[in-house]
Design a protein with these regions (language model features):
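N-terminal beta-strand motif that seeds the catalytic metal site of vicinal oxygen chelate
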Residues: 1-17, 72-75, 124-127
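Helix N-cap motif at beta-to-alpha junctions
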Residues: 14-15, 80-83
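Short, charged/polar surface micro-motifs in flexible loops or helix N-caps
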Residues: 48-51, 62-64, 82-84
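Short amphipathic alpha-helices within nucleic acid-binding modules
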Residues: 21, 83-88
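Short, charged/polar, Gly/Pro-enriched secondary-structure boundary elements
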Residues: 49-53, 118-121
Length: 127
């Protein structure tokens, strides 16, 4: 039986570009470690999340992009100010898939963006 959720891994095409995107969302780099001569793993976390969950960004030497498939959808992160988060991302050329919206009248405000490798990230501001 599983006892703890540890991390989500994304395979990325360029380390610094992906790290910068997640830093813009508030993630911090926890550790960067080479895996022999095959890959580099960068573990990132949000302040206050403790040891887990972590986002693992894996760069495999010699691979520029990956087929994302259709089964996976997104990760979700809470933001304190959705408008200012989107403004900061827009400066870097990252725009929402569609304008922010609420799923119910008093519900959270949400929108989706894509990271530099095309992975969807849901941004959620409490209602």
């Amino acid at each position: 039986m599983a006892t703890k959720y540890l991390h989500t891994c994304y395979r990325i095409g360029e380390i610094e570009r992906s790290v910068a995107f997640y830093e813009e969302l508030g993630f911090e780099e926890v550790v960067r470690m080479p895996i022999r001569d095959e890959a580099i793993n960068v573990f990132m976390n949000l302040p206050g999340d403790g040891d887990v969950p972590r986002l693992e960004l894996t760069y495999n030497h010699g691979v520029d992009s990956y087929e994302l498939g259709t089964g996976y959808n997104h990760i979700a992160v809470a933001v304190d100010d959705l408008e200012s988060t989107l403004t900061g991302l827009a400066v870097k050329g990252i725009n929402p898939e569609k304008p922010p919206y609420r799923v119910s009248e008093n519900g959270p405000q949400i929108c989706f963006v894509r990271d530099p490798d095309g992975y969807r990230v849901e941004l959620i501001q409490a209602g």
